[in-house]
Amino acid sequence: MPPSRKSLNKAATCSLLIACLLAGSALASGLLFDFAAFGSFKRMNHTGDTSGQVRLADLPKAAGAWGVGALSGLTGEILLHDGRLLVNRGEDHRGRVSDARPEDEAAIFASARVRQWAEGPLPKEMPQAEFEAFVVEQAKKIGLDAEHPFPFLVDGIFPAMTWHVVTGKPSSPAHGAGGHVNKHAGMRVFEQSGVSGRLVAFYSGSRFEGVVSHPGERFHIHYVDAAREASGHVDAYRVGSGATLRLPVK
C-alpha cells in the first residue's frame, strides 16, 4: 500500500525538524520569552564547523535580554547580561571580560527576553545534579513546560565552581580536565571555591537538547562574578544555601 498523504507530510515535517535542529535553527520563533537559537552543538560536533551563525551586533540588547554562547572559531565565550554583551577571549589569566567588537560573530548562541521573574531561596546547599533537578521541579510548579527551553538566573555563593573559556588555540588533554573535552579548541580552565556571583543559564528541554546544550545534557550555564568582570562557560558547580533562583514568568 502506498503511503498516505498524511504519512508523507509527517515524514517531511520530521525531516525538516531534524535538518533545522542540526543547522541550529529558526524553530525557535514563536516560543516563550522570545527564545532564539543560533548554531548547534550537535552539528558542530559532527562537522567541526565553528563558523559564525549570527553577528553579535544583530543580537537583542534591550533590558531583559539574556544569552549565552561562544564566538566563531571557538575563540571566546559570550554572555548577554540584561542587554549588555560581555565577551571573554581567554586572554586574561583572571578571566576578565571585554566589550564585543563590531566584527564578532557567534558559532553557538541562545537568547531570551524576560520581563518578569519569579524568585525564591534555595533551601539548602545542593550539588549540580540535585540543583538542576530542583530547577526543573520549580519550573513545573509555576507552569513552565519542561519539554521547552527557558532561561533562569541564580545569585549567591557557590562553594565549588569550575568554568572555562575557549581560546581557539589547539586543544590538549589538560584542557579537558575541568569539564567538557572540546576537540575543536583549547580552553583556559578556572577552578574556584566559595565565589559569589550569578549563573545565567538556559534549560534546553527535549526540543533543543544538543542544540543549545551539549548532546545528552539539558543545561547551558555561564558564570559571571559579582563585579560583572569575569565570566565563562560552567562545567561543574555547587550552589550554596540561600542562593536566589529566578525563573521566568509567562
Regions found by a protein language model. Name each.
Residues P2-S15:
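Bacterial N-terminal signal peptides that target proteins for export
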